[in-house]
Amino acid sequence: MKIAQIQMHVSADKAENIRHACDLVRSAGDIDLAVLPEMFCCPYDNACFRDYGEPFAGPAQRAMSQLARERGIYLIAGSLPELEGHRVYNTSFVYAPDGTCIARHRKIHLFDIDVEGGQRFMESEVLSPGREVTTFDTPWGTMGLCICFDMRFQELCRLMALRGARVIFAPAAFNMTTAPAHWKILFRQRAVDQQCFTVGTSPARDKTASYVAWGHSIVCDPWSRVIRQCPSREAVAVTELDLSMVDSVRRQLPILSARREDVYRLTEL
């Protein structure tokens, strides 16, 4: 399975962001799946989310559907602000090669942090949380999907793995405070926990932005090896995933099958 991570520069011009995302996906060539970063068409700023938001089947989503159909690929459209009534969600839409929307993930764990001497951000001041674990089916098997801060919650990723997820995709805009300490180790740890590939796709770093993303989009294999990491600048990274590794690692080190459900149990509500 060949994937492309689109680590793109995000500007204040929504229409230009959409055009740029389409151009970068086209530049990836012959791929099976592309993934865009968190808030790919909107500055990562509470002051922007509602103004840049759109309802289901809005203009950014229509463009992504058309792009998936044009390229004949699966497309994880990073995330964007989704409007529903008075609520705003941080939402990732997934499109099949025929342009059909086959999955929607609304960020479950909102990014509310206040690090002494570092980053402060309160998504909950504007955004509402999602309530559903998200997986989707492809010819290569089941894929899991979460957004940024969701990736810190092992329980959520375990539920995806128990559904059969072979890859966990996370569009993610980590920042200059948390990412140097946690970005690489977090994606490696989720790969260890769930014995699957983990794919983190960031916006490119823009030092002039109000919120500065880390960049360094990453892919880890089921043995927790980093097999791809981008620089901080804009990049299109194409990686071939050997999904037979998932079965091999789970067979050799049977963590999922060795769980003691007579002692403890993780349930999905």
Which residues make up each language-model segment?
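Short beta-strand-to-turn element immediately C-terminal to the catalytic PLP-Schiff-base lysine
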Residues: 95-97, 220-221, 239-240
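A conserved C-terminal secondary-structure "cap"
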Residues: 246-269
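Short, acidic/polar
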Residues: 16-25, 152-158
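Short polar catalytic/cofactor-binding loops
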Residues: 7-13
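Cys-nucleophile CN-hydrolase/nitrilase-fold catalytic domain and related Cys-dependent amidase chemistry
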Residues: 14, 22-104, 113, 174-196
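CN hydrolase (nitrilase-like) catalytic-core segments centered on the catalytic cysteine
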Residues: 56-76, 142, 151-237
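Active-site catalytic loop in hydrolytic enzyme cores
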Residues: 83-163, 176-185, 252-255
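Extreme N-terminal starter segment of soluble prokaryotic enzymes
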Residues: 1-4
